[in-house]
């Protein structure tokens, strides 16, 4: 399963639609457990890094991102 991180910004639905087109199982989530247990993680972009970081910190998603990248889990950040 691929976790698409939901931080109230980004092109979530476009990424989800593309993954479904490719036959991939995915979930849009900000749930730590779903992100930690996913096989792969995608962080959709907004084109404004400062705004993205503000939202990630608001939901404390920066912590789970550090965790999954430290574990060398496949991680894709888009347009940040």
Model feature map: region roles:
Residues 1-76, 80:
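N-terminal beta1-alpha1 cap of cysteine-dependent amidohydrolase-like domains
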């Amino acid at each position: 399963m691929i976790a698409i991180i939901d931080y109230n910004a980004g092109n979530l639905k476009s990424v989800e639609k593309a993954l479904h087109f490719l036959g991939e199982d995915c979930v849009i989530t900000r749930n730590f457990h779903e992100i930690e247990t996913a096989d792969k993680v995608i962080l959709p972009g907004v084109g404004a890094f400062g705004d993205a970081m503000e939202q990630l910190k608001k939901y404390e998603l920066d912590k789970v991102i550090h965790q999954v990248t430290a574990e060398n889990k496949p991680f894709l950040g888009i347009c940040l």
